[in-house]
Swiss-Prot record:
Family annotation (HAMAP family): SHMT
GO biological process assignments: glycine biosynthetic process from serine; tetrahydrofolate interconversion
Gene responsible for this protein: glyA
Pathway(s) this gene product operates in, as recorded in its UniProt entry: Amino-acid biosynthesis; glycine biosynthesis; glycine from L-serine: step 1/1
Keywords recorded for this protein, A-Z: Amino-acid biosynthesis, Cytoplasm, One-carbon metabolism, Pyridoxal phosphate, Transferase
UniProt function note: Catalyzes the reversible interconversion of serine and glycine with a modified folate serving as the one-carbon carrier. Also exhibits a pteridine-independent aldolase activity toward beta-hydroxyamino acids, producing glycine and aldehydes, via a retro-aldol mechanism.
Subunit record text: Homodimer.
Family: Belongs to the SHMT family.
UniProt-recorded name of the protein: Serine hydroxymethyltransferase
C-alpha cells in the first residue's frame, strides 16, 4: 500500500464516521456536536499558530489576531458565568483540574473528592491528577438512596480531616451537589472549594442547574464539549479569592505549569460557543433538562429501572438506568447491543457496585444534550425509549432496530441553538 493510499484510508474512515454518527442516536453524556460556525473556527489557520502566556504578553510574536479572539473569549465567559476571571487556556477538563491541584495545593495536602463508584472523575483519584500532585485523597460519604453526598457525614469529615481542598462535581451527575451546605464548613477549616463542572457547564451557563460560584465555590474547572457544546478543551473560572499571590500561583500552574501552547483553534471555537450560549443558552439548557426528564419517564414506563424516581429522576442532562436485572453482565451486555442498533451510550458503575465490576457494571449512563442540539423534543425521547426497550427487553434483532433508528435520526441533521440555524421548531 502506498502512503497516498494510507492518506485515502484515513480520509475515508473520517467520512464513514461522520455519516455513521449523523445517523445514530448519540446518548454519550460526555459528547456533543458543534455548530458550523464553531467547526469553521476549529478548522481555521489558528491551528497553525503557537502562543504562550497571556494575550498581549506573549513569548511569541505574530499573535495580534489570536490575542483579540482570546480577549473576546475572556469577556464572554466572565459575562456568561458571572466570574471575575476566565482562563481559556486549559486544553481539557483534566488539564484544568491538574492546574487547580498544582496551583492551590502542595504534595501531602488532603483532598476530599467523590469516589469513582459514586460518579467521581478519574482525575480526582489517587491514580489521576490529584494523586500525581501527591495529594492524600479521601472520598465524600455518599447516600445511595439520595444519589448524592451525605451532608451530615460530610460536615464531620471536613472538620475531622481539615483538607486543603474539597472537590464537587463528577461524571455521574444527575443532581446538584450540596455546595451551599458544605462550602462554609470547608472554609472554616481553610479549604479551597473546587467545582468540576465538566458535565454540567452548559446547564450552568443556561441557568438550569446550581450556580457554584454563588453557592460558595472558589473555582470552577470544566471541559467545553459536553453540555457546553463547544470543541474539546477546558476552562477555569473563578471569583476573587484569597490573596493576589494565590491567584498568581493558579495562573502560573496553568502556564508554564501544565501546558505551553493552548491549541488556539480550539480556543477560537470556545469563544464562538460562548457567544452562542449567551444568545441561546437558556432555551437550550432548559430543553436539555426537559428532554432528560422525558426520557427517564419514558424508560420507566417501558419497564426499565431508572434511578432517582422519588426526585424526578434527574435535574441535569443525565439519565441513569440500572440494567442488572436484565442480564448477568448488565451494562457490559447492554451498551454493545445498543450500539449494534445505532444507539450509543456507555456502561457505568453505580454507587453500590464494587470497582471490580467496572467491565460489567450495573448501570447505563445516558445524556440527551446532543440529541437536544439537533432539534429533538420530549416526544422524540419517547421514541428513543421505545427503541431501547425493543433491543434490551423485547430482545428484537438490533440490526432490524438499526434500520428504524437510521430513518428516525435522518430527520435531525441541523445543529440548532446556534447562529447558523437558530432555534428548532416543534412539529
Amino acid at each position: 500500500m502506498s502512503y497516498r493510499e494510507y492518506r485515502d484510508r484515513v480520509l475515508n474512515f473520517i467520512e464513514d464516521h461522520e455519516h455513521w454518527r449523523a445517523h445514530t442516536i448519540n446518548l454519550i453524556a460526555s459528547e456533543n456536536v458543534t455548530s458550523p460556525s464553531v467547526t469553521r473556527a476549529v478548522a481555521s489557520g489558528f491551528m497553525h499558530k503557537y502562543a504562550e502566556g497571556w494575550p498581549r504578553q506573549r513569548y511569541y510574536q505574530g499573535c495580534k489576531y489570536v490575542d483579540e479572539v482570546e480577549l473576546i473569549g475572556v469577556e464572554l465567559f466572565t459575562k456568561l458565568f458571572g466570574s471575575d476571571f476566565a482562563d481559556l487556556r486549559p486544553i481539557s477538563g483534566t488539564n484544568a483540574n491538574q492546574a487547580a491541584f498544582f496551583g492551590l495545593t502542595q504534595p501531602g495536602d488532603k483532598a476530599i473528592v467523590l469516589h469513582t463508584s459514586h460518579g467521581g472523575h478519574i482525575s480526582h483519584m489517587p491514580f489521576g491528577a490529584a494523586g500525581m500532585r501527591g495529594l492524600e485523597v479521601h472520598t465524600w460519604p455518599f447516600d445511595n438512596e439520595a444519589f448524592n453526598i451525605d451532608v451530615d457525614k460530610a460536615e464531620k469529615l471536613i472538620r475531622e480531616l481539615e483538607p486543603k481542598i474539597v472537590v464537587f462535581g463528577g461524571s455521574l451527575f444527575p443532581f446538584p451537589h450540596p455546595v451551599k451546605e458544605l462550602a462554609p464548613v470547608a472554609k472554616e477549616v481553610g479549604a479551597y472549594v473546587m467545582y468540576d463542572a465538566a458535565h454540567v457547564l452548559g446547564l450552568i451557563a443556561g441557568k438550569q442547574f446550581q450556580d457554584p460560584l454563588r453557592e460558595g465555590a472558589d473555582i470552577i474547572t470544566a471541559s467545553t464539549h459536553k453540555t457546553f457544546p463547544g470543541p474539546q478543551g477546558g476552562v477555569i473560572l473563578y471569583k476573587k479569592f484569597g490573596e493576589t499571590e494565590e491567584i498568581a500561583k493558579l495562573q502560573w500552574a496553568i502556564f508554564p505549569g501544565v501546558l505551553s501552547n493552548h491549541h488556539l483553534h480550539h480556543m477560537a471555537g470556545k469563544v464562538i460557543t460562548a457567544a452562542e450560549m449567551l444568545e441561546y443558552g437558556e432555551k437550550y439548557a432548559a430543553q436539555v433538562v426537559k428532554n432528560a426528564k422525558a426520557l427517564a419517564e419514558a424508560l420507566a414506563e417501558e419497564g426499565f429501572k431508572v434511578i432517582g424516581e422519588d426526585k424526578g429522576y434527574t435535574e441535569s442532562h443525565q439519565v441513569i438506568v440500572d440494567v442488572s436485572d436484565l442480564h448477568p453482565a448488565a451494562g457490559g451486555w447492554a451498551a454493545p447491543l445498543l450500539e449494534e442498533a445505532g444507539i450509543i451510550l456507555n456502561k457505568n458503575l453505580l454507587p453500590w457496585d464494587p470497582l471490580e465490576k467496572v467491565n460489567e457494571p450495573s448501570g447505563l449512563r445516558i445524556g440527551v444534550q446532543e440529541m437536544t442540539r439537533v432539534g429533538m423534543f420530549e416526544d422524540d425521547m419517547k421514541e428513543i425509549a421505545h427503541f431501547i426497550r425493543r433491543v434490551l427487553i423485547d430482545k428484537e434483532d438490533p440490526k432490524k432496530v438499526r434500520r428504524d433508528v437510521y430513518g428516525f435520526r435522518a430527520e435531525f441533521q441541523k445543529v440548532y441553538y446556534s447562529f447558523d440555524h437558530g432555534l428548532p421548531l416543534r412539529e
